[in-house]
């Protein structure tokens, strides 16, 4: 109601706003609305309206035109929405909306509609309605504008509802990766429209993509390589217009593979010395460490693994040599680091070299023999030279210096320059030793010149603690005196740190950091002096000692004597030639000059001369100069060339003041450059700074040179700076991870000045920029579960540092098959084991430096073969099982399975309920039996007489007096169906006769019938060996005769005289037809017994014992039984005498199972009298051949119908003592006469009642023994039978139905009514032509029952009828009469004349 009021108010407001804006528009709107109505119904238009015939169109009228088209909308459920539509036309068109072709009802037309049509024509939805089953607002809408001139339609606009379900189709799962590995978290969002957008959150922070590392594609969160900081809780977020959904949190666990902080190193120790291998690792989770020896066991008793995981071995011996490996592993990965141990004996001299003095041109040899373990290597070195002489290596073309394989040094044709100390060194892995000897040359002197330094000290980089020799070999005459100074400080000979030898060599035994600096060798004599400068500096840890020379490694030989070619006042031009015997190539030349006018020393006047000719400028005029030339090579300066001849410059001008010819060179030599510590600015970039001391006015620029440290032969890379004031520069493009040596040299007008000591700086490492080379994958030893991955290091230019380790991945087609390993930097292969056979793997290798992991190699595919005894089927099935498991875990499958199980459970419950209900409905069928006779009309050919067909010879055909619903015996396919049946399947339920006798009385009657005679002329044929009779078989011990020729004849005629009013046969209808036995009724019915065979047993009636506990159970109906009537007189029944029995066997009464009324018992008879059913003779009764007497005067019913067509009285027939067997008919209903006294007790053996199991839930299909007895044929005479047929045939169906009204007659005690009230002349007796005395009718004619024929039933329904009425149980004293289920008892009794009299047997 509230919603309706809101809609109404909204409509009113909209309409009021429209009126306020434009009243004329409202009138036009009204006009348009009326026009649209008229367009829809032309009868509404006034006569002559132009919209009827189109002949009167206004000059300004126009057809509608859509000017604003409705757009496509996607809206959220529950939100308002508007589909705009505006149209033009005159008169103003009316707007209508259509959805999917159907007109849309708005609130203007239907107050219940939730859509509103706005004055502008727009369709307004206050709230979009959308559900799982009902989606009324979603669809395709069309706006139609109409006036009398026509209509215009808009475009089709779709309105879609945004939907976003709650459940994610796949929620992200926890992921565990190692640092550096890729990680993928998958998420499939819930279904929605529009398709939801997927984003990710870490905690509460939205993730953003990082180029090259974090990518979000299709709901997947992909990380190319993970960091430790990536660990955390991640959520998948799906959003669209309908809202936002967050998945459950998934954890990303980033573990760290073991990595070494300190690795074990290779160690060489002497025997009996201890050794310690360090190993320190980190990882997450904390790795476990253990040690192993690759080629043996750890030395027992001498090793110890300390708390810091280091391996300590004491007193090592040669047996301990080998490789020791530290193994660290955790759940993420495994890492190994190895160190080797070597135990050696240091080398020792066997023969040492001795000093020798020879003349120039002679040959000389120095012996040097050593020993050690392993054997040491021997090499020679001339003191002060960097050249090493190894065995079998010729250093000069003529081979003057040669070392033999035994270590002997041989010098041929000794020259003056060969003099000096020669050092023999023996080196092995255990250590090194050396010894030296002096070679002196006789007659080598120069007179009148300052000392000449033949070989001076070289610049050296030394390791702290090492020994160093600084040679200073000088010639001169007189013999010069050699002195040393360090950093401009003279060294004294008594200094314990420095040892000044006799030949001028300075020896420093164990150099310390304080010993580093500038050293100068000064040779002085009386004529002059000579100076040679050099420096020493500390070698850093990264430094490397120079290796053996691979080519000529000695300095170039001395050039030839320089020759003066041109002389001026200020310059001299010199020419020389290189030494042809030099083993090394001269790269440049240095020119030295001496002039007594300039001083008493040799000075360098030119440096870096590239050609063999040079012009020395800046000389003083008219001055004598001497020159010598030195060659410069990769291994240092050569010895000086022979001194040139003296040369004097020209005299230019006597007035010009004399100038110092060495002023420029001397000034640059005094400029000192001091380097500062370089600064790393970035990758591959270094800033170099320096300071300048001395005469800076002579400096015109600087030369900055650098090279990779450890390569003394490496070339320098130079950068010239032309600015004298710039004292810093930036070096770019430096190799990563390398140690760089840098030096600075000043530049002036006269050339280059002194060099600065070089400094060393490390360039930061970078991750390798190139992948490892030659990656290959080979199958392992087992060839189906392991592979070996091998590789080579990256190219040197791509390493960018020292390779510390390699990362190797072996990736399967799923993340759970991924494996990874790490290997040391020196390793070249690794083996993966435990792989799955048949799986395809990709192998990748990446090198790593301290800066990180570099570029991985291209994947190399390898597929492991299946084992020989295995096939790929299990693998495929395993994969299929895994895929099925994934499908089973999907929410959609679980929801569908739950729905299916629920539907099955619901169906099962419904079936169970229906079955229970049917059981309840059929519960009375389980313990009851009934039959409903129906009217049948015979065919003439079936009733023509005894000659055309046997009297009972229906054969396999059905009985015409039985309803079609009565089960018939089996027939052959050729048997014909009985014709003339009426109402075969739907008998009138009102035409049933109910017997209220309880089950207890029924059982009691059955027990009494076991040894009693029958109750009337109704016969019961029971197969004593039938299946259903086994229940009651114990109650008939006298029926155990095995004679197959005997028949059972019973039911004396005295019992047939009871009036119908005294026969209260009551019944109940069977639920369904049941199967008939294979035996037909004509085969089972015996001829009627004579009346003389019956006798009356006497004795008081005895109440059945144990009946109360059986009242709720009803046994199955016997296979074939006939209704039994009770006698109406108080006379006792007479048992048949054997002598009066016309039958071949004696007949004994057997209680009919079709009645529930107790009957007098029969006296015990011999068991041989009762044959089994299958032993009875199949005799055909003949027609009547002797006069018959009917036991009752009237044969028609009270309704005027012949006997057999109505519920008339039961007749009793007596067979005459004729040898020809007679036939008898039975009444259609079962009647009995109940006396006022108790039923006489049974005589003889009490029938033992066998209780039938109660386990049967219901009985739809009854066995042959469950059938109620069929009615016997009606009595007839030759003259009365046609009449009976005519009466039956002349009745209409309506009359027959009326004749079927139920009449339940109360049993009246004997003597309670006068005989005349009980019996009287039957109104139809004359019609049938029957005499008052009893007569016999021929037996064998079929009886035709009316449609309303009564039935008898045993019931266990929860009513009084289940326990029986007083009358059905028998009255006891004051017990009243039985109940009546039909019309009044008085009316029923008044219509029946009293016929109760006792018939004596004839």
UniProtKB/Swiss-Prot annotation:
Modification type Phosphoserine: residues: 1263
UniProt region (Disordered), positions on chain: 540-561, 639-662, 965-989, 1032-1307, 1340-1402
SMART domains: FN3 (SM00060), IG (SM00409), IGc2 (SM00408)
Comp. bias regions, Basic residues: 1243-1254
Biased composition (Basic and acidic residues): 1294-1304
Fibronectin type-III domain mapped to chain residues: 558-652, 672-766, 771-869
Cystine pairings recorded for this chain: 85-143, 187-236, 279-326, 368-424, 472-521
One Pfam family from the record: Ig_3
Residues modified by glycosylation: 25, 34, 53, 156, 355, 363, 410, 459, 503, 784, 813, 820
Transmembrane feature ranges: 892-912
Domain Ig-like C2-type: 64-160, 166-253, 258-342, 347-440, 450-531
Compositional bias of kind Low complexity: 543-552, 1178-1191, 1215-1228, 1358-1371
Localization per Swiss-Prot or TrEMBL: Membrane
Entry membrane topology: Single-pass type I membrane protein
Side Extracellular, residues: 21-891
GO cellular component: axon; plasma membrane
Expression by tissue: Detected in embryonal spinal cord and hindbrain.
Signal peptide residue numbers: 1-20
Any one GO BP annotation for this protein: commissural neuron axon guidance
Keywords: Chemotaxis, Developmental protein, Differentiation, Disulfide bond, Glycoprotein, Immunoglobulin domain, Membrane, Neurogenesis, Phosphoprotein, Receptor, Repeat, Signal, Transmembrane, Transmembrane helix
UniProt note: phenotype after gene disruption: Deficient mice lack embryonal spinal cord commissural axons crossing the floor plate.
Gene3D superfamilies noted in UniProt: Immunoglobulins
Quaternary assembly: Interacts (via Fibronectin type-III 1 domain) with NELL2 (via the EGF domains) with a 3:3 stoichiometry; this interaction promotes oligomerization of ROBO3 resulting in the repulsion of commissural axons in the midline.
UniProt function note: Receptor involved in axon guidance during development. Acts as a multifunctional regulator of pathfinding that simultaneously mediates NELL2 repulsion, inhibits SLIT repulsion, and facilitates Netrin-1/NTN1 attraction. In spinal cord development plays a role in guiding commissural axons probably by preventing premature sensitivity to Slit proteins thus inhibiting Slit signaling through ROBO1/ROBO2. Binding OF NELL2 to the receptor ROBO3 promotes oligomerization of ROBO3, resulting in the repulsion of commissural axons in the midline.
Family stated for the protein in its record: Belongs to the immunoglobulin superfamily. ROBO family.
Protein name: Roundabout homolog 3
Organism: Mus musculus
């Amino acid at each position: 109601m509230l919603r309706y009021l809101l809609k109404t108010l909204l409509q009113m407001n909209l309409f009021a706003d429209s009126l306020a804006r434009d009243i004329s528009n409202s009138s036009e709107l009204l006009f348009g609305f009326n026009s649209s109505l008229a367009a829809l119904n032309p009868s509404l238009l006034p006569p002559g309206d132009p919209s009827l015939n189109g002949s009167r169109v206004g000059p300004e009228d126009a057809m509608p035109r859509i000017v604003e088209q409705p757009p496509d909308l996607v809206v959220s459920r529950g939100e308002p929405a508007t589909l705009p539509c505006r149209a033009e036309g005159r008169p103003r068109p009316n707007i209508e909306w259509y959805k999917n072709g159907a007109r849309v009802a708005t609130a203007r037309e239907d107050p219940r509609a939730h859509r509103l049509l706005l004055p502008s024509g727009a369709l307004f939805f206050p709230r979009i309605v959308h559900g799982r089953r009902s989606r009324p607002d979603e669809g395709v809408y069309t706006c139609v504008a109409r006036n009398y001139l026509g209509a215009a339609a808009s475009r089709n606009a779709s309105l879609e509802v945004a939907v976003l379900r709650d459940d994610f189709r796949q929620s992200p799962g926890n992921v565990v990766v190692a640092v550096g590995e890729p990680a993928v978290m998958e998420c499939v969002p819930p279904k929605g429209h529009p398709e939801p957008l997927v984003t990710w959150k870490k905690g509460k922070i939205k993730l953003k993509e990082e180029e090259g590392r974090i990518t979000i594609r299709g709901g997947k969160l992909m990380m190319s390589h993970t960091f430790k900081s990536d660990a955390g809780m991640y959520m998948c977020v799906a959003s669209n217009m309908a809202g936002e959904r967050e998945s459950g949190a998934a954890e990303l666990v980033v573990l760290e593979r073991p990595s070494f902080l300190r690795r074990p190193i290779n160690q060489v120790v002497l025997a009996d010395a201890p050794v310690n291998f360090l190993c320190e690792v980190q990882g997450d989770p904390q790795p476990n460490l253990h040690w192993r020896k690759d080629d043996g066991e750890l030395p027992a008793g001498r090793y110890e693994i300390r708390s810091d995981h280091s391996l300590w071995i004491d007193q090592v011996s040669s047996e301990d040599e080998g490789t020791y490996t530290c193994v660290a592993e955790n759940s993420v990965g495994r890492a190994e680091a190895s160190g080797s141990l070597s135990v050696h004996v240091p080398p020792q001299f066997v023969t040492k070299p001795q000093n020798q003095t020879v003349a120039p041109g002679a040959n000389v040899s120095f012996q040097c023999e050593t020993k050690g373990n392993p054997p040491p290597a021997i090499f020679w070195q001339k003191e002060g030279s960097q050249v090493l002489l190894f065995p079998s290596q010729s250093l000069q073309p003529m081979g003057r210096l040669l070392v033999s394989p035994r270590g002997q040094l041989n010098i041929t044709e000794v020259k003056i320059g060969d003099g000096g100390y020669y050092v023999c060194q023996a080196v092995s892995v255990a250590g090194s030793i050396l010894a030296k000897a002096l070679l002196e040359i006789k007659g080598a002197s120069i007179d009148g010149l300052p000392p000449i330094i033949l070989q001076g000290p070289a610049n050296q980089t030394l390791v702290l603690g090492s020994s160093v020799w600084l040679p200073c070999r000088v010639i001169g005459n007189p013999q010069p005196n050699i002195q040393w100074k360090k950093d401009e400080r003279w060294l004294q000979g008594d200094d314990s740190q420095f040892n000044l030898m006799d030949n001028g060599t300075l020896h420093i035994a164990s150099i310390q950091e304080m010993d580093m600096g500038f050293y100068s060798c000064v040779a002085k004599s009386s004529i002059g002096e000579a100076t040679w400068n050099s420096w020493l500096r500390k070698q850093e840890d990264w430094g490397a000692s120079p290796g053996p020379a691979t080519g000529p490694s000695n300095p170039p030989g001395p050039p030839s004597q320089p020759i003066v070619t041109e002389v001026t006042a200020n310059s001299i031009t010199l020419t020389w030639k290189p030494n042809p015997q030099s083993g090394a190539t001269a790269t440049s030349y240095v020119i030295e000059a001496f002039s007594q006018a300039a001083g008493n020393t040799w000075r360098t006047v030119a440096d870096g001369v590239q050609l063999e000719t040079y012009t020395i400028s800046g000389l003083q005029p008219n001055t004598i100069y001497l020159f010598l030339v030195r060659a410069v090579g990769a291994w240092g300066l050569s010895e000086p060339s022979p001194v040139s001849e003296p040369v004097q410059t020209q005299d230019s001008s006597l007035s010009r003041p004399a100038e110092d010819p060495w002023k420029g060179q001397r000034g640059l030599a005094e400029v000192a450059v001091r380097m500062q510590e370089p600064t790393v600015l970035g990758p591959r970039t270094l800033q170099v700074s320096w300071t300048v001391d001395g005469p800076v006015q002579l400096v015109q620029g600087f030369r900055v040179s650098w090279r990779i440290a450890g390569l003394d032969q490496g070339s320098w890379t130079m950068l010239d700076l032309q600015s004298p004031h710039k004292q810093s520069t930036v070096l770019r493009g430096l190799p990563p991870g390398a140690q760089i040596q840098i030096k600075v040299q000043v530049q002036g007008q006269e050339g280059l000045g002194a060099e600065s000591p070089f400094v060393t700086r490390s360039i930061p490492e970078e991750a390798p920029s190139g992948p490892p080379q030659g990656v290959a994958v080979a199958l392992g030893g087992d060839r189906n579960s392991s592979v070996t991955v091998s590789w080579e290091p990256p190219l040197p230019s791509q390493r960018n540092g020292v390779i510390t380790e390699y990362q190797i991945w072996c990736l399967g087609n799923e993340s759970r098959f991924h494996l990874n390993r790490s290997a040391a930097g020196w390793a070249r292969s690794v083996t993966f084991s435990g792989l799955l056979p048949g799986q395809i793997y990709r192998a990748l290798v990446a090198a790593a430096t301290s800066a990180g992991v570099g570029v991985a190699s291209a994947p190399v595919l390898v597929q492991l073969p299946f084992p020989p005894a295995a096939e790929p089927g299990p693998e495929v099935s395993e994969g299929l099982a895994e895929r099925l498991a994934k499908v089973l875990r999907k929410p959609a499958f679980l929801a569908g399975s739950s729905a299916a199980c629920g539907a099955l459970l619901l169906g099962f419950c419904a079936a169970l309920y229906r079955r229970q209900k049917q059981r309840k409905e059929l519960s009375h069928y389980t313990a009851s039996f009934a039959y409903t006779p129906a009217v049948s009309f015979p065919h003439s050919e079936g009733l023509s007489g005894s000659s055309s067909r046997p009297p009972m010879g229906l054969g396999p055909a059905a009985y015409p007096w039985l309803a079609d619903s009565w089960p018939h015996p089996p027939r052959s396919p050729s048997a014909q169906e009985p014709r003339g049946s009426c109402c075969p399947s739907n008998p009138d339920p009102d035409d049933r006769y109910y017997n209220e006798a309880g089950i207890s009385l029924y059982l009691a009657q059955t027990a009494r019938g076991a040894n009693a005679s029958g109750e009337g002329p109704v016969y019961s044929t029971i197969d004593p060996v039938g299946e259903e009779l086994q229940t009651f078989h114990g109650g008939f011990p006298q029926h155990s005769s095995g004679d197959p020729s005997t028949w059972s004849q019973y039911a004396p005629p005295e019992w047939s005289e009871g009036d119908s009013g005294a026969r209260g046969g009551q019944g109940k209808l069977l639920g369904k037809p049941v199967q008939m036995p294979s035996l037909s009724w004509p085969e089972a019915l015996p001829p009627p017994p004579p009346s003389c065979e019956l006798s009356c047993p006497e004795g008081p009636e005895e109440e059945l014992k144990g009946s109360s506990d059986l009242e709720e159970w009803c046994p199955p109906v016997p296979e074939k039984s006939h209704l039994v009537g009770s006698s109406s007189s108080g006379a006792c029944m007479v048992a048949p005498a054997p002598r009066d029995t016309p039958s071949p066997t004696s007949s004994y009464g057997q209680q009919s199972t079709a009645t529930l009324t107790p009957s007098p018992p029969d006296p015990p008879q011999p068991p041989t009298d009762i044959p089994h059913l299958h032993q009875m003779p199949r005799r055909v009764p003949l027609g009547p051949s002797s006069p018959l007497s009917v036991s009752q005067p009237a044969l028609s019913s009270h309704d005027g119908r012949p006997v057999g067509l109505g519920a008339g009285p039961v007749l009793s027939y007596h067979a005459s003592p004729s040898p020809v067997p007679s036939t008898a008919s039975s009444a259609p209903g079962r009647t009995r006469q109940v006396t006022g006294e108790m039923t006489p007790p049974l005589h003889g053996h009490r029938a033992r009642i066998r209780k039938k199991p109660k386990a049967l839930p219901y009985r739809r299909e009854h066995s042959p023994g469950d059938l109620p007895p069929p009615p016997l044929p009606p009595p007839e005479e030759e003259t009365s039978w046609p009449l009976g047929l005519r009466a039956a045939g002349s009745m209409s169906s309506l009359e027959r139905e009326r004749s079927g009204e139920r009449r339940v007659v109360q049993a009246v005690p004997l003597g309670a009514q006068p005989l005349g009230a009980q019996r009287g002349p039957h109104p139809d007796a004359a019609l049938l032509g029957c005499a008052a005395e009893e007569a016999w009718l021929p037996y064998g004619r079929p009886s035709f029952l009316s449609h309303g024929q009564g039935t008898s039933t045993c019931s266990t329904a929860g009513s009084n009828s289940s326990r029986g009425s007083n009358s059905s149980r028998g009255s006891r004293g004051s017990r009243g009469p039985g109940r009546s289920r039909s019309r009044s008892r008085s009316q029923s009794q008044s219509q029946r004349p009293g016929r109760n009299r006792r018939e004596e047997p004839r």
